Amino acid sequence: MKKVFIVLGIVLILLGGFYFLWSNPELGQNVGNSVTAFFTDLFEGKYVPYNKDFEINTLKVSNCDYYYNKLTEDQQKMYTAVAISVKNLEQMAKVRAYQNNVDDDIVKDAAVAMEAFFADHPEVFYVDLQYEVYTVKSVFGKDIEIKLKYTSEDKNKIKAQVVEISKKIDEILSSVESHKSDIEKEIEIHDKLCDKIKYYEYTDINSIPLDMHSVYGALVKGEAVCDGMSKSYQILLDRANIENILVVGKIEELHAWNLVKIENEWYNVDITSDKSIKGEDTFTIHSYFNVTDDVIQSTHTFSNKELLPEATGTKYNYYTYKNYFIDSNDNFNDKLQKIISSSKDSNILEFSVNKNIKDVPDKMISSMQSNKNTGYLTENLTRVSYYNILNSYVIKKIK
């Protein structure tokens, strides 16, 4: 007898320390492609061992096995099958002789495997969240079928969308010179992506269009919410041969950002928070560029911290690397003036300060008044309008 479990959305559960990544509608609308799970004795000629060189489509993501390596062996088999099915644009997934006979466990394993796959593969954007899991008793365990719904029944349309994304990726990366260091590439990709994407404003989280969660919405339509932005950064860094991971957690609602590896040290980057200052679309900031776990955890909560590498690097924090960090009261004025001088061609001034420095706004005003930095002062040169994010300050030039 065949049993069916209709999954309308991936339920947020904790299984072996792994939170389902897209359980919230803001993160969960645009998962992957067909799931097809099968072993070597099924579908002769289609089974291929999964590895990080396995290509789903022409977008050719290579850093794509981080979460795969966190799965159990059975979950890895499902994940491998998902990858093969997506590559072939197939709808029905099948697993022969799955060893776990408990239906609830099978459904959970499928969800965990799928979420790991989608977190590793930002290039997969064309399957609806709703899917069905079927189980059938067999001599060697249970056979499993997973049926997914594509966002389009037209395979040629999906392939055309992949081509559109590929062109946008090439446009962004065309000016990122290969001889540059990884940190310079990372900054340039961050800034170019922020320039091209607008944060999608919504009033009802359940009504966000599927595209706004995907690389297609971000790169082709120019709008996205957090996961669409983070997946786009993920795929661009991957193409630049910079190792990175998609991360899920919370600010107030579920949220996505990236972990990026530079010179063997990991850093957090939240491109959404660097782009989505409310009402400000004219500039990009770097308050959440290459920050440590300790720093980002003052505003963010990790959902799956135990699965992730520790991000403790400080050398390539944006403000440290650019020498936009003021470390003491004694050199505040001199350092601020150097930062202002080096930022003269920018429409904003941004820097960070040692957390022990107090009365930063007053010190800014005093320094700007003394040095006639009138382009940042308001109200008869007695006030400065600024954003304070973490330990960074962002001031928009007014003239």
Indicate where each model-derived feature is located:
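Hydrophobic/aromatic-rich core segments of domains that either
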Residues: 228-294
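N-terminal hydrophobic targeting signals that begin at the initiator methionine
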Residues: 1-2
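Secondary-structure boundary elements
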Residues: 157-218
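A short, highly charged nucleic-acid-interacting micro-segment common to nuclease
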Residues: 215-229
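N-terminal accessory/pre-domain segments preceding catalytic cores
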Residues: 5-180, 296-399
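Solvent-exposed loop/turn segments at secondary-structure junctions
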Residues: 195-199, 204, 225-226, 251-254, ...
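Alpha-helix capping and helix-loop boundary segments enriched in small/acidic/polar residues
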Residues: 81-83, 220-224, 246-248
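Loop/turn elements at helix/coil->beta-strand transitions in domains of secreted/extracellular proteins
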Residues: 181-187, 195, 240-244, 263-265, ...
